């Protein structure tokens, strides 16, 4: 069982949040975590993973073009992504910087791929996914770990019911 954590990060802020998501995945026995920036991710990485957690900084209220180009470029494997788990995380420079719309743009792409999407757990806010503004990294680090763990636990549960 594998969870892919992929992201775009120009300054390192989103990468740092991706690493926290990875920490959460690693807490679940039997689930491997593959973490890659979106410019290094391959179609095989998508196909070989049971779940995809994607992250982006906010760019004009949406995901970065670099991450969107992955979804656009992988359109040919959409049918093979049906039923896989999807989740999202986002970062912004400012507190009211469009994080929720960015999360929704990522989740929307996952829905178009036929994926089953999930938000962050209730003990991490219970919204569309994990998001924070610059300077809030320490506050939301634990929420990213919780998201990664929640995704990995669902991978295990779904694997047990399909086997």
Regions found by a protein language model. Give the residues of each.
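Helix-loop-strand module that forms the ligand-binding subsite of alpha/beta enzymes
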Residues: 38-122
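N-terminal beta1-alpha1 ligand-phosphate binding loop
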Residues: 1-28
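A generic structural motif
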Residues: 28-33, 115
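Glycine-rich phosphate/pyrophosphate-binding loop and the adjoining helix
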Residues: 41-42, 116-163
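Short hydrophobic segments within beta-strands
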Residues: 6-8, 36, 89
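A generic "alpha-helical surface" signal
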Residues: 12, 61, 101, 138, ...
């Amino acid at each position: 069982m594998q969870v892919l954590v992929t992201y775009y990060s120009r300054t390192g802020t989103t990468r740092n949040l991706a690493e926290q998501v990875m920490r959460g995945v690693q807490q679940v026995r039997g689930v491997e975590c593959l973490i890659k920036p979106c410019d290094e991710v391959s179609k095989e990485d998508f196909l070989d993973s049971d779940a995809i957690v994607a992250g982006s900084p906010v760019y004009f209220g949406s995901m970065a073009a670099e991450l969107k180009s992955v979804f656009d470029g992988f359109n040919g494997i959409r049918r093979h992504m049906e039923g896989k788990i999807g989740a999202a995380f986002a970062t912004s420079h400012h507190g009211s910087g469009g994080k929720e719309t960015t999360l929704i743009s990522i989740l929307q792409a996952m829905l178009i791929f036929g994926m089953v999407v999930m938000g962050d757990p209730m003990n991490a806010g219970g919204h569309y996914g994990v998001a924070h503004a610059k300077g809030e990294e320490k506050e939301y680090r634990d929420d990213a770990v919780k998201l990664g763990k929640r995704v990995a636990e669902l991978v295990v549960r779904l694997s047990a019911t399909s086997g």
